[in-house]
Amino acid sequence: MAAAMTFYRLLNRWGEAARSLRLGARCFGVRVSPTGEKVTHTGQVYDDKDYRRIRFVGRQKEVNENFAIDLIAEQPVSEVETRVIACDGGGGALGHPKVYINLDKETKTGTCGYCGLQFRQHHH
């Protein structure tokens, strides 16, 4: 939210384009470096003179545009009844080790350290 407000204030002098930006909007997608090269999910980007660019000579750098962190951020917070929740990432071979998350406080949103899913205790 703060980033969107700062962005809105910086662009405010340019008129209607800045005012049409929704507050709280989050930009998803692939970032592009000043050289025009796509930035990967790990922030990997090389300078023009970097020797590691040799692997892309004669072919295009392929970047998956669906970053996992962006996909997880779109997931809503899960409301649960219990005070302690166990997250195993979906179970089976595709999951992760089972972790237990305490949801003691009313305002606390517990986040799984492996998969990033968020949980909140529903108080009745």
Curated annotation (Swiss-Prot):
Main location: mitochondrion
Family assignment from sequence similarity: Belongs to the complex I NDUFS6 subunit family.
Protein name: NADH dehydrogenase [ubiquinone] iron-sulfur protein 6, mitochondrial
Keyword Membrane found: yes
Modified residues (N6-acetyllysine): K98
Localization per record: Mitochondrion inner membrane
One Pfam family matching this protein: zf-CHCC
Membrane topology label: Peripheral membrane protein
Gene that specifies this protein: NDUFS6
Record GO biological process: mitochondrial electron transport, NADH to ubiquinone
A GO cellular-component term linked to this record: respiratory chain complex I
Signal peptide boundaries: none
Purpose: Accessory subunit of the mitochondrial membrane respiratory chain NADH dehydrogenase (Complex I), that is believed not to be involved in catalysis. Complex I functions in the transfer of electrons from NADH to the respiratory chain. The immediate electron acceptor for the enzyme is believed to be ubiquinone.
Keywords recorded for this protein, A-Z: Acetylation, Electron transport, Membrane, Mitochondrion, Mitochondrion inner membrane, Respiratory chain, Transit peptide, Transport
Quaternary state and interactors: Mammalian complex I is composed of 45 different subunits. This is a component of the iron-sulfur (IP) fragment of the enzyme.
Feature: transit peptide: 1-28
